[in-house]
Amino acid sequence: MQIKLANPRGFCAGVDRAIEIVNRALEVFGPPIYVRHEVVHNKFVVEDLRSRGAIFVEELDQVPDDVIVIFSAHGVSQAVRTEAAGRGLKVFDATCPLVTKVHIEVARYSRDGRECILIGHAGHPEVEGTMGQYDAANGGAIYLVEDEEDVASLQVRNPEALAFVTQTTLSMDDTSRVIDALRKRFPAIGGPRKDDICYATQNRQDAVKQLADECDVVLVVGSPNSSNSNRLRELAERMATPAYLIDGAEDMQQGWFDGVERIGITAGASAPEVLVRGVIQQLQAWGATGADELAGREENITFSMPKELRVKSLL
């Protein structure tokens, strides 16, 4: 069996920044540091931060007064920000800047009284945060659609004053079909020049397609609650390549690889490379050879840290 590695894979700039914000806060201020929601959707990362003093909560009413709170990479609603400010909590915002870009678009449509359609998955924290940027006080409304069927049944107030945005971690192929359905049903609809799916999601989806084309089975390292990791698994399966979403080497079954010649490995944007290395080591123990990385798109994007953490870490 031969191992092939997707390129790029694993951590993106937004995840790197979010994890580093928690790390720096722990170093500068000491534990405990409260984090609203898992800072990124990866069990290994969350458990590591928890062991060092991060306390993960789902709502601010679980947070005592006079502590530091970090908002996760997925972003939060305006109501959460207002609650934190009203309680005087010290907040560091780890929202991915590409999610913030979508928030700004939604807030602008809200101010203009323009109805907005969000393409996304119900219940995902990014979707909840993005929906929560819309203030209907100016007469508009925001709607959530997941697929073409939702578009077909959607009732809006004014199809002439309508715009769309998208969750950043969706399947590009699925989203393209939903956007086409929106434009067909609502010809006057506005939106971003291209969808809001982030560069890292696009690059990892392109890479897994190449991997699935060249391999007999694909392993996606990522947690079950990671949206972008699930999309990678689905893309490989759509290309008729068996694919498995695993948290790490311990989730693998040797029988998956009976009769397999080429094993492809990729990782979601929240999965650290150490987990990929663990998978490679286990496969090699089962007789696999090599770990050749495919040609791919270079990523050199970085996002700046909050100023207070950046300055204090140098003292």
Curated annotation (Swiss-Prot):
Gene3D superfamilies per record: 3.40.50.11270, 4-hydroxy-3-methylbut-2-enyl diphosphate reductase, catalytic domain
Functional pathway: Isoprenoid biosynthesis; dimethylallyl diphosphate biosynthesis; dimethylallyl diphosphate from (2E)-4-hydroxy-3-methylbutenyl diphosphate: step 1/1; Isoprenoid biosynthesis; isopentenyl diphosphate biosynthesis via DXP pathway; isopentenyl diphosphate from 1-deoxy-D-xylulose 5-phosphate: step 6/6
Residues noted as binding dimethylallyl diphosphate in the record, renumbered to the chain: H41, H74, H124, S226, S227, N228, S270
Pfam families assigned to the protein according to its UniProt record, in alphabetical order: LYTB (PF02401)
Active site location: E126 (proton donor)
Main function: Catalyzes the conversion of 1-hydroxy-2-methyl-2-(E)-butenyl 4-diphosphate (HMBPP) into a mixture of isopentenyl diphosphate (IPP) and dimethylallyl diphosphate (DMAPP). Acts in the terminal step of the DOXP/MEP pathway for isoprenoid precursor biosynthesis.
Listed name of the protein: 4-hydroxy-3-methylbut-2-enyl diphosphate reductase
GO MF annotation: an example: metal ion binding
Native source species: Pseudomonas syringae pv. syringae (strain B728a)
Class of enzymatic activity (EC top level): oxidoreductase
Residues where [4Fe-4S] cluster binds: C12, C96, C198
Cofactor note: Binds 1 [4Fe-4S] cluster per subunit.
Catalytic reaction list: isopentenyl diphosphate + 2 oxidized [2Fe-2S]-[ferredoxin] + H2O = (2E)-4-hydroxy-3-methylbut-2-enyl diphosphate + 2 reduced [2Fe-2S]-[ferredoxin] + 2 H(+); dimethylallyl diphosphate + 2 oxidized [2Fe-2S]-[ferredoxin] + H2O = (2E)-4-hydroxy-3-methylbut-2-enyl diphosphate + 2 reduced [2Fe-2S]-[ferredoxin] + 2 H(+)
